[in-house]
Amino acid sequence: LQRYAADFARRYQSIPKYQVYNTALLSYFQGRGFKTEQLDPSRWGRWVESAIGAHLVNYTQEQDFDLYYWRDHNDEVDFVIRQTGNRLMALEVKSGHRQDNSGLHVFADKFHPEHSLVIGGDAFPTELFLSTPIERFLSL
């Protein structure tokens, strides 16, 4: 994924974020099972973020939106959806109870997305996000 920036040229000045298209392949090549991944909060967090990212990347093939990430120093947003007309939606993925969403607030101040959503943890359930057609979120 490319880094989101309002200026087109700046999007391609940053190092892209690696995103798998299929988390089954990620799990297979890491040689760990689902239950083993869940036992390590750090690894589980990366796995959940990868699952959400794969879900979104696969939808970019069907829907009219572009997918990015955003980072500015220590502030980060896991996924930024840009729809037609530069409508933005910011998504932050949480796999545990740690709810530091400061990156969402900084991003909102800079870019004014129409919507922001925290997925997982004590927020919007991960399973519900993955089982809901992405069009529902894009039409909010």
Question: What is the role of each PLM region?
Answer:
Residues L1-Q83:
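Accessory nucleic acid-recognition modules appended to NTPase machines
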Residues Q19, Y68, M89-L91, H115-I119:
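Hydrophobic/aromatic beta-strand patches that form the interior of the parallel beta-sheet core
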Residues R87-H97:
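Active-site ExK catalytic segment of metal-dependent nucleases
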Residues S95-L138:
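Catalytic cores of nucleic-acid endonucleases
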